[in-house]
Amino acid sequence: MIHPLPDSDCERVVSDLLAYMTVEEKAGQLAIVQAPDPQDRAETEAFARAIRDGRVTAVEGIGSKLQAEAFQQIAIEESRLGIPLLFPAETATGVDTIFPAPLAAAASFDMDAITAAEQVIADEAHSRGINWALGPAAGYLRLGRGASHPSSAEQVHLAARIAAARVMGLQAAADTSREGVLACLDLSRILAPSSTGGRQEIADALRIAAHVSQQGYLGSISFGGADARHRNALQRAFSFLQGPGAFEGMVLSEWQTLAAAARDSEHVEIGDYMPIDAIVAAIEKRQIPLSRLDDAAARVLRAKYALGLFSLPLGREAVRRRGSLPTPIQNRQAALDLAKKCCVLLRNEPAMLPLGVDSGDILVIGNSANDRFLPVAGRGGPGASVIDGLEQLGIPYKFAPGLALRRENGTVGRLVEADSMAIGMACEAAKRSRTVVVVLGECENGRLAEAEHQLLSSLRTVTERIVLVTLGTLPLDPVVSGGPLPAVLHAGQLGTMSGHAIAEILTGEAAPCGKLPVAIPASEHNRGLPFGHGLNYADFALTDLTLDLATDHIVASAQLRNTGEVSGVETVQLFVRRYRGRHLPSRMELRDFERVTLAPGERQTVRFELAREEVGEFREDGRLVAEGGTLDIRIGLSAGRTLGGEIELPDAVARAMGSFVKGLPGSAADSRRRA
């Protein structure tokens, strides 16, 4: 577990070290250096000298835990001040066990499952000597932007909640039995020069950073390579990070700024060689204030203290204290748990899922059903295929490829001559089957390729009992032969346990509870579905919306009832829009959500408290300000299925929202917790 900060003992250690450190050693606390080739003795010896001289703070690219411990021993026992090292690495969606990709995980809306997944990732990273994860990378997917980068959702609030859950998992914030690793909140995908880089992007990054930092200590934060045009705006907006008693973690953009100032250059990337001697010279010439270097070095020392490195055991004591880590079986179970919660049932009318006795003979169509590398998307592998999952459950099925094989790693695109025979064979097999399950892989830009569309169109001429399962990044709800398919399950890239999760959902061993983290826009290719849409094997109804104004917050509530015949999980979502004069924006902003489990016939009142974080907006100076005005507040099961009303927020209540604390005894949140 990462030690919470601030801490008086930590400040004493940091203060004492800074008093003894030379300017060169302080600059060395900002130097991330690539590990040497173990076979190159000269390079390894030179690297060891740099550690002894205090010119290295972090080592990238270590090959094993033993190598990390060897470097750590040099730093602690042979350097002048014995300051330990960090070992950073990209952990992404898994080290040994591959978890669902960012957009797939976002569909779960389950922060506990995401935190548990990151705890496993931290354990596996720690077993390799890594103690600093260069993630999570926060991002959102606006309509029309494509899915070329990892994204959490199209709604900033969901992206912020997921980022906080990932940080808590990596840093083992809720589990004292785990070591944890430092996390780094990476906002570069939002603030990159290639993006629009405007005021809205900065406000979104502020909302994410503020939400994550409110949950507890954050090891580090990175803004990436903002260009000169946006750098001043960023520095002004995020100035709160530098204030006394504010953010305690490492600010990697400050390292870049110091390096660029010392080199007299426009821009320096994280991971570039840190010009230690140039920084020393710039400070001696008073081109860089020593206080800036002291602050940056102090943040690194605090991070190392929080990680427990100043009391790090070495040698035999380290082996004795390592204890037992979760086994691969437990890790895979955590991956399976999250993967099942990521599946989104887009359509099921008539109710063809779950598969059962009435499903009759099952025909599985699509080469993607056999693909063990598609679910991990090049992040490791292999994972479990859909066929693997069905066979483990003992489900009898027949198989047809549906389309001709493409070259290795080739994507399905236009029809080829061999497709005609494959489609014909699939249609003949479909005539002799009661239920057809079609499994498709990556679909470019969220639409069917020509060959895939022809396959589904041909199948629909011989049967209506088609279940479509999609494994691509983006969800799709295709229009085939003039209308939507009866049953569509979007799984996405679910990682190591993908096939087992999908098979359990298809057969009813588990129930779907995922929600769309991005809307499917309506077009000639897709019927279109709203953000937050996702069906269940149970049925839910939302009624009795109430909006109440208190002295310092707003309470919105509605009653959720399970009208189905089985238990289920529903995600109730809160949306807010603010009138701009007489204009009401078409886009609703997600501001909160709650997952609720109900038995058949059971009902529960779901309450949301809205204060400054929910109704406020970030200003250019980084302040979150709530203003009076007319708000449109909606509670729903998706952005397209809501109950809503307008409420006038007085200026006095808006000003008082800054002092409201959620969850105090007697508050709505406290009542919900006790219910």
Regions found by a protein language model. Give the residues of each.
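Short, contiguous strand/loop micro-motifs
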Residues: 107-109, 196, 266, 326, ...
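N-terminal beta-rich core of secreted/periplasmic extracellular enzymes
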Residues: 1-186, 201-272, 280-309, 335-351, ...
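Alpha-helix boundary/capping detector
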Residues: 43-44, 85, 151, 326-329, ...
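Eukaryotic compositionally biased low-complexity/IDR segments
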Residues: 188, 194-199
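Short helix-loop capping/hinge segments that flank enzyme active sites or metal/cofactor-binding pockets
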Residues: 299, 307-313, 317, 440
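Feature marks short, surface-exposed loop/turn motifs that line or immediately flank catalytic pockets
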Residues: 95, 141, 191, 371, ...
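C-terminal non-catalytic regions of proteins with extracellular/luminal or membrane-system context
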Residues: 1-8, 41, 127, 199-212, ...
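Flexible, acidic loop-helix segments that line cofactor/substrate-binding pockets
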Residues: 311-329
